[in-house]
UniProtKB/Swiss-Prot annotation:
Name the UniProt record assigns to this protein: Uncharacterized protein YALI0A18139g
Keyword Coiled coil found: yes
Segments passing through the bilayer: none
Biased composition (Basic and acidic residues): 24-54, 326-336, 629-668, 679-689
Basic residues bias: start-end ranges: 669-678
Residue stretches in coiled coil: 361-628
Lineage, uppermost ranks: Eukaryota, Fungi, Dikarya, Ascomycota, Saccharomycotina
Record organism: Yarrowia lipolytica (strain CLIB 122 / E 150)
Amino acid sequence: MTTTDSPSVLQDKDIDRLVNAQKKPQEEPTMKDKALLFEKQRQEKKMKHTEAKMETNPLTSAKTFRKAPTEASTATTKDSTKNVNNATSTNNATSTKNNTKNTPKNTPKNIPKNTTAKPPIPKSAMKPSVPAAAAAVSTSAATAPAATASVSVSEPAAAFSPASHDMASFMTGDTSAAIECLMNGTSTSTPQKSASGISTNKHVNAAASQVNNRSNTSNSFDSHTTQKAGSYNPNITNILSERELDSTDCYADSESRSQPHKPSVLLPTTVLTDNKTPTYPPSPEFFSDHTDARDVRVGASFVNHKQPYNFARNNHGSDVSSAMDNARRQASETRRSNLSSYNDRNQPAAHSYLRTAPNHMEKIRTEVDKEQTREKKLARERLARKQQRDKFDLLQTPQTKNKFNMQVPLDMSEEQLFEVICKLTTQLDQSQARVREVEELVQQCSEQLNERSVEIDSLKSQYEEGQGEKEMLVGQLEEQLKRVSEEKDVELRQATERMEKELNDVTATKDHEIQQLKQQVQDLTIQLSSATVSDVKTLRTDYEHYKSQCYRKDVMISELEARLQREENLEKFETELKDKEKRLIKTELRLGQQALEQDHERQKLEVEKKVLGEKDEEERLRERLRELGSRDRSYNRSSRDRSHDRLYERSPRSRDRSSRDRSRDRYSRSRSRSRYRRRSDSVKDYSVGPRDKGDLRSLALEKIIDFLLARQKAGAQRAHMDACYNVSGPGVRYGDGLSDATVEKVLKEFLNKDEGYLMDLLEGDGKRLDEYLGTIYSGVGV
């Protein structure tokens, strides 16, 4: 159980080898590995000794080994993880020896080469002390019999771990496979009183799955969290609860039993909400405790005693609208509080097949990021360490505080020292070779530099030549510019002199012209002054003559205006007379029409009365006859005849009554319908034949006026209906159908027509006239 804690190169190397075991090619077991294995065997002997002691006292063994395995495993795993990689060849040898010892006669003959024969479980495994010891020993790859048992039993665990191999890995020296085999296979425990191999396999599976839990959690959703043995992981296919494992299991009490039971399958359950609130998957506690599981509806409250809404209770006033607002606010607040409390109480499961809550996802993401950054940091440190190790130099002074100062442990063997020295020399050779390479590189670089410097010198000389040429050119250009500027100045001077001469000439000529013009103006003014005096005299005489003529014209105009006024007044009086005549004719016609209507109605009423009177008399007579008949024959008749007669009596009476009702209905209907049609019908009653030709104009006028009146009545009724029921929109109203413009237009049309035209119009019972009137009427705005 002793560990060498002194810092050494070997321990770090071994850690790195374990980490990179998958990547490295297969190695042969070295001298160092053999030396380490020798130490292992020494430790195994010690363990055997303690085991023998424990077997003698079975009572204490159960108690002590309850705690022992965890301590032993924690103590020894440090060594095992460092040194298991090297424990291949001799372990293999010891296991084969032990197999030969422990194998009884009934071993199967046909065993494949790569596998070892399965021995039956030794008697020591039946005792309660052994499983614990085996577990403790196997974690650190301890005692030979235990090792063989563990390896042989771990063969069925190949189904679980993808990298686990059989004993062939030990033979071939595949170190990574051997480590996998030891890690996955040996952390088993044989239960008490297990005679057959089946039960051991079962527990091996359970333990192997637990180990896989710890190592291979890359598939599970929360791979950043460490999975403890027995913790809930839905990716494990066969889940064994703690109650199924035996009480002698070495891991029985290492995990607390206080965790609640978690189901293997989370079924999706519906939570009724409105669409705005997210739905979370139910918590695992939902299955065990139904009291807390509530659905979060819009109005639902977690307060069981619900108070009825009180209008007096609101603070914002007693009117209904504010009360409604208050109620709405309350509902939304309760919904919010319900949701928050529900989320607090039922936090979603870590892996749910349903939607995970966004805040939970954020937590998970942050944890994952932390884990990744930590891993990156570790990897970086490891790489830095490796680089330092590569640079390791023998000539380092011991004063420098370097990790790799050779503090050799006392128990290091010669082989190990020899190997270390070999390695260091190879490293030195490599570094010298590298130095040589670097020197060659430096030489090459210096040659290139020399070449480049030569090129630069040549370029510089070229550049200087170019600069000289440029200066020459610039000088020439400056001289040219000077020459050109002088020439331009001379030209300008000449031009200005020329212009000045021309200006002087022009000004002299202009002055002469101005003097001449002034002289002319003076002459003209003298002439004008003499002429105006004579002109004024003539103008005055003309003006007086004109004035007298104008006065005469004014007198004439006033006379003409008076005459025009008289004529206009006469025309006005004539038009007024015509209008009055028209109105008289209209009123006479209207009165005649009304008289006609009244006569018509009176006649109808009389006829109706007569008809009704006759019918009533008939009815009365029939009733009387019936009564008399029924009195006479009531005693002589049978019931059948009576009923027959009754039917006979009923039918004509009912027929009569129905016909009477129908006639009444018809009359009333026709009356109501003809109320608005009568005038237009009466227009068509006129016939042209018997009248005189001189009477045609008056007949046409009568017909026209009738038409217009009918139109007016229809229009008025329509306007009335419109006002009552607002049939058309509010802006559109029917006029009463008879505006002054319409009447005037129609009458003018007809007063101007000749008789032949009127005859044509009135032919065919006045149909042409109706059509004509329709066209006129539609043309005029009502």
